[in-house]
Amino acid sequence: MDFRIGQGYDVHQLVEGRPLIIGGVTIPYERGLLGHSDADVLLHAITDALFGAAALGDIGRHFSDTDAAFKGADSRVLLRACAERVKAAGFTIQNVDSTVIAQAPKLAPHIDGMRANIAADLGLPLERVNVKAKTNEKLGYLGRGEGIEAQAAALLVKQGG
């Protein structure tokens, strides 16, 4: 079997006046993530991991932050489009593992919803999608609550490989 592993990363600044959307879940908080789209840091990291595993570039190549068509875009729509492109390139998505690093708010109550959204968007059973939440132990810009970061890994299998 031809296995492919991809790694994804994203970070966005926290600002007032924007909703906080992570993993397709709107989380009650006084600030949200700044970005061209809905700035869903988790879905962007997963999208990058999938594109990377398939050697299809990155999220910016497919959904440019300078393209008005993606202004305010729902990152779940982008993730579904990514999955379609990965499948069209002859790959099957096996699993996704991810970590969100945020000093606040607490994300644990929202992880089940995030996992369900990601599994649905990728057409995977829930047990093949994992989301972890960590703080940065008050260190650096993440620890000061200036932004939220996400990291992801994805495993693909090339069909006929």
Swiss-Prot record:
Binding residues annotated for 4-CDP-2-C-methyl-D-erythritol 2-phosphate, in chain numbering: 10-12, 36-37, 40-48, 58-60, 63-67, 102-108, 133-137, 144
Keywords in alphabetical order: Isoprene biosynthesis, Lyase, Metal-binding
One record GO biological process: isopentenyl diphosphate biosynthetic process, methylerythritol 4-phosphate pathway
Cofactor: a divalent metal cation
Keyword Ribosomal protein: no
Listed GO MF terms: 2-C-methyl-D-erythritol 2,4-cyclodiphosphate synthase activity; metal ion binding
Alphabetical list of InterPro entries matching this protein: MECDP_synthase, MECDP_synthase_CS, MECDP_synthase_sf
PANTHER family the UniProt entry points to: 2-C-METHYL-D-ERYTHRITOL 2,4-CYCLODIPHOSPHATE SYNTHASE, CHLOROPLASTIC
Subunit structure: Homotrimer.
Name of the protein described by the UniProt record: 2-C-methyl-D-erythritol 2,4-cyclodiphosphate synthase
